[in-house]
Amino acid sequence: EPYRRQRQMCIRDRYIGQCYLFLRQVENNPGETLLQEWLPGEKEQWLAEAHFLIAYYHFALLRKYGPIPVITEYVPQSTPSSEFGGRCHYDYCVNWIAYQLDLAAQNLPPTREGTEWGRATSTMAKALKARVLMYAASPLWNGQFPFSSWKNKVNTPGDKDFFVGDDAKYKESIGRDDYGIELVSSSYNEKKWERAMEACQKALDFALNEGGCRLYGTEASDMTLYQTELGNNDKWLPYVPGKEDNNIQENREFKERVMMLRYMVASRYPHNKELIWGLTGKNINSRIQGRIPAHIFQTGNKTSWAGGF
């Protein structure tokens, strides 16, 4: 298990490095070896996608390990560990990630379709920013961290420059000129909740409008999608003890709601408009393995536990 955790961290660090390598190649390349000709806005969108992923991978590490080193440029593999400054203050990490997502959202489309589905959008960037800020406002990272003696060996710089646009009003109430060697704030700041709530509302409004999203089940087509596919009969309705008679309106509505909840997590794109960032890279085997109790399932040669179990 310790090896598995270390491997996950290394993978995300590697992805961050690959993103920065991509940015360097794009910025330093006129386009001949990448594309014969840039389409209007294409280069800016590629750069924005890379910044979105950099922010996302930093958040994935932050969520798992707390304060982390913030990587702002490509780091060669030969770099000695002595040149790394260590972890940054948790709030600094949060504000830097939020800033990166704001920048990325400026050059990302609100939606994707067809073969581009799953690539970064401004809707995803705003939703991810809202989640990052919600974590930062929660009690663990907002005044109730149990290990007050946990300190860094080097100072974390200030982050007021990260508060731009609508976040500029929180520059003085949340941002700092210098964090010193502190890694987690020991004092409660109500402004963090205010900022998080505002980000959530903006993300929701943007998703409902520019993003074309809506809650699943709010339109009649959600209730009848698979009824149409399976035929206009009652065979698509589930069996529910005590509610066998489909001619009773209450029974029918209950069964339709049961089916709606089933298809909410199984509907194929683009039927479920509630999806903001769909994940299509997982197969059924990985989901099954993820539900198997620890030390039950071994690899084929029986030398290790599959999936880390």
What are the functions of these language-model segments?
Residues 1, 35, 62, 114-118, ...:
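Short, surface-exposed helix-loop/turn micro-motifs enriched in polar/charged residues
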Residues 1-11:
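Single conserved hydrophobic/aromatic residue that forms the stacking wall/gate
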Residues 5, 68, 123, 135-309:
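An aromatic- and glycine-enriched ligand-binding surface/loop that stacks and positions planar moieties
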Residues 8, 80-88, 116, 181-188:
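Second-shell loop/turn segments in exported
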Residues 12-31, 40-70, 90-108, 117-143, ...:
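Extended, hydrophobic/aromatic-rich amphipathic alpha-helical segments that build helical scaffolds
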Residues 21, 74-77, 112, 134, ...:
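Short, flexible loop/turn elements at secondary-structure junctions
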Residues 31-36, 110-118, 143, 208-219:
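Surface-exposed patches in mature extracellular/periplasmic domains of secreted proteins
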Residues 35-39, 73-80:
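Short linear capping/connector segments at secondary-structure termini
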